[in-house]
Amino acid sequence: VGSEMCIRDSYTTEHYKELDALGAMYQQAIKDSIRDWIYPGYIGSFYDAYNPEARKLFWEQMNEHLYSLGIDAWWMDASEPNVQDNTDIEYRKALCGPTYLGPSTKYFNAYALENAEAIYDGQRSVNPDDRVFLLTRSGFAGQQRYSTATWSGDIGTRWEDMKAQISAGLNFAMSGIPYWTMDIGGFSVENRYMAAKEGSEDLREWRELNNRWYQFGAFCPLFRSHGQYPCREIYNIAPEGSPTYQ
């Protein structure tokens, strides 16, 4: 039995100010007052994970408020980094840099690797005998050395989306990274599934899709279900006694 928490620091917090004092916060999102999706929307940005001092400080903040209290597994979402969804290339360049190493266009794809390094090295420095576990939405070559697992992101909830995970997982494994997973059932749910009524063809299909996806997930390195409404617990997919479970 465990718990999950989502923590997002606004630019008004002490954590932000500490990293900003190092010159290690991307500034464009602050200048443009970009708000995240958590109600009512907070203005914030990402830290420069390419800066070794910023990585050290990032872990110190995590250690002080989380790891030292017994939290020892990490789910790092939006680690592309995804400062804002669906931006054009030029604006994305501005949102994600400049980095400590140079222009964002040259180093952008390695952000998840550097962020994982911050957490792995930081936790090991505090307790070298404690196993590190990090789940991240993005990956880069070599990240397995940081005890990192990756899932395939906010995928759709269609049959073709489930099919696409087969090749995605195989390609990931062939890249030398053993721990890969996906959102069983898909993450971004079609409206017809969300509005489906008991006895409808859409609800029957939703249950069948989840049934097959759970079966597929049982053979993946990590078994996890996650996504938007409807609820994803196995017992919430269908009522007791449903053919879905047979």
Predicted regions: what is each one?
Residues 3, 8-246:
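Catalytic-domain carbohydrate-binding cleft regions of carbohydrate-active enzymes
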